[in-house]
Amino acid sequence: MKILYITNGIHGAGGLERVLSVKASYLADVLGHEVHIVVLNNKGASLFYEFSAKIQLHHVVVNGNPISYIWQYIKGMRDIVATLKPDVISVCDDGLKGFFLPLLLPKIPIIYERHVSKQMAFGVHPSLLKKLRVALQLQLMNWLGRTFDKFVVLTQDNVQEWKLPNIQVIANPLSFYPENQSSLTNKTVIAVGKHTYQKGFDRLLQCWATIVKTNPDWSLEIYGKADEKQGMFQLVKQLQIENNVRIFEPVPDIATRFLASSVFAFSSRFEGFGMVLIEAMACGVPCVSFDCPCGPKDIIRSDEDGFLVPNHDLDDFTQKLLQLIENQELRNKMGAQAKINVQRYLPEVVVKQWDELFKSLAK
C-alpha cells in the first residue's frame, strides 16, 4: 500500500516529529508499505529523530504573502498527489490549511490526525478579540473535520472536544522500550518539555522549592528547548534552588536520561497526549502528573503505576513527589508496574491499529 503523510515538517525535536518517525518507519520497515512524507520548506535541514531510509521525502516551497503562500501550498499538494497516486493520505497539520485538503485534492481516502488539544489554540491570557477569532476558527475546523474519511485523535478527552461522527481514538506509539529499566536509586527527578506556559515548569519549580528543604541531596533535571522569555532561570534564582536544579537542551537519546532518574514529574497545564509520560514509564520510572487535559488520565493508572493529581493542586503534587522520593519500595513497585502497563503503547500494538484503518479505507 502507498501511504502519503502531509505535514509541516519532520526536522524538529517535538512530539509530532518523534511520533511520525516511529509510525512511518514501522509501516515501511516492518509492515512493508511504501511510505511518502511531504513537508514544507525543509529541504536540506537535518533530522533530529531517525526516519527509515525506505521513506521517501518530498518538499514543497511556500513563501510570500498569504495568497501566494496558499496558492503554492495547494498547487504543491495537488502536484505531489497526482504524481504519487497514493492509496491513502494522512494529514498531520495542526493549522487550519490542512483541514481544506479533502475539498482540494482528488477523491482519495484521507485521514486527519489531531495531535493537540483545542485549548492550545487560545494561547496564554488571550484577549477577547483572540478568543472570538479562535472560536470561529475552531467552529470552521469542526465543520471541515467531517469532510475527512476518519478524524483520528489521541485521547478520550479529544473525543469530547470534537464530537465528530467520523472520530476514532488511536494513541501515540512508544518510541523506545528498553530491555532494562531504571534502578530508581539515583536521587534525580526528571522533567521534559519546551519552556512554555503550557508545560507548567513554573509550577514544578515552586513545588521543588518545598521539596529540597527536606531533601537537599535530590536534583531536578529539566530537558527541553530553553526560552529566556519564560523566566525559568530567573525563577530558579528567585526560589534559591540553583544547587538542586539543572536545565538542559533537548537530547535525541532521552531514554538514557530516564534510565538514570528515579521519578518523572509531569507539570503541564494542558497537553495533546503526553509522549514523555509513556517514555518514562517504558524505562520503569514512576510518574507524578497533574490530571490536565488531555492524556494523563488515559495513560496513568493512579496509585498503581504513578500518581494523578488534580490540576493546579500544587500542594498535592508536592506531597506525591515526596512520597516517591522518600519511599524506595514504593518507587520500585510503581516503576515495575509502569513498565508492564505501558506495553499497550508498543508500536506493534498501536501501528497495527493504523494499518487496519488504512486497509479498511483503501479497499
Predicted regions span which residues?
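A short, well-ordered alpha-helix in the C-terminal region of glycosyltransferases
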Residues: 316, 323, 330-344, 353-356
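N-terminal strand-loop element at the rim of the active site
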Residues: 5-13, 18-20, 26-68, 161
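Conserved donor-binding/catalytic core segment of Leloir-type glycosyltransferases
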Residues: 4-6, 181-199, 205-208
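Aromatic "clamp/platform" in nucleotide-sugar-dependent glycosyltransferases that forms part
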Residues: 250, 269
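Donor nucleotide-sugar binding/catalytic pocket of nucleotide-sugar-dependent glycosyltransferases
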Residues: 138, 142-179
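Short hydrophobic beta-strand element within catalytic cores of glycosyltransferases
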Residues: 286-290
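Conserved acidic donor-binding segment of nucleotide-sugar-dependent glycosyltransferases
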Residues: 301-303, 307-314, 322-329, 343
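Short His-centered aromatic/hydrophobic patch
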Residues: 91-97, 114
